[in-house]
């Protein structure tokens, strides 16, 4: 029985190993990035511990490549920004730019294609974008 519990513990540990966490500067928003079955990138967003998005799948489907599955995480970078910028027009003459950032680098081992997903969590929202670094196996894409 102890041996079975030990095996179950390590199987569960492995399923959480690929999950990455990011929180907003005030700690109210929490994002979890994970790889689902078949290397499908996904994320979850909580506000004050309650789910806002339970499972959002990520990726790009193009005419040239399927960038929605078959990924392995190869790198992770984090950053925090807290500065101000001055808009040219609008209600405010100074705007605070305050967020925590996480960039996840994914690679498809079968194709060698690389996709970066950059998440930014502000106190009042989430933004993310796909970045396709220059690479031999992908000269152009039609989305």
Language model segments and positions:
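Sec/Tat signal peptide C-region and signal peptidase I cleavage site
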Residues: 15-19
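Sec-dependent N-terminal signal peptides
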Residues: 4-14
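N-terminal accessory beta-strand-rich subdomains and adjacent acidic, glycine-rich linkers
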Residues: 21-143
């Amino acid at each position: 029985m102890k041996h079975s519990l030990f095996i179950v513990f390590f199987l569960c540990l492995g399923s959480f190993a690929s999950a990455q966490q990011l929180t907003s500067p005030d700690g109210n928003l929490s994002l979890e990035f994970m790889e689902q079955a078949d290397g499908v990138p996904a994320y979850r967003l909580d506000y004050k511990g309650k789910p806002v998005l339970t499972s959002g799948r990520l990726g790009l489907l193009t005419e040239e490549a399927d960038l929605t599955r078959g990924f392995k995480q190869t790198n992770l970078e984090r950053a925090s920004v807290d500065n101000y910028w001055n808009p040219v027009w609008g209600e405010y003459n100074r705007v605070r730019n305050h967020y925590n950032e996480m960039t996840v680098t994914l690679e498809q081992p079968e194709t060698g294609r690389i996709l970066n997903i950059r998440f930014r969590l502000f106190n009042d929202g989430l933004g993310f974008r796909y970045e396709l670094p220059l690479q031999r196996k992908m000269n152009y894409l039609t989305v």
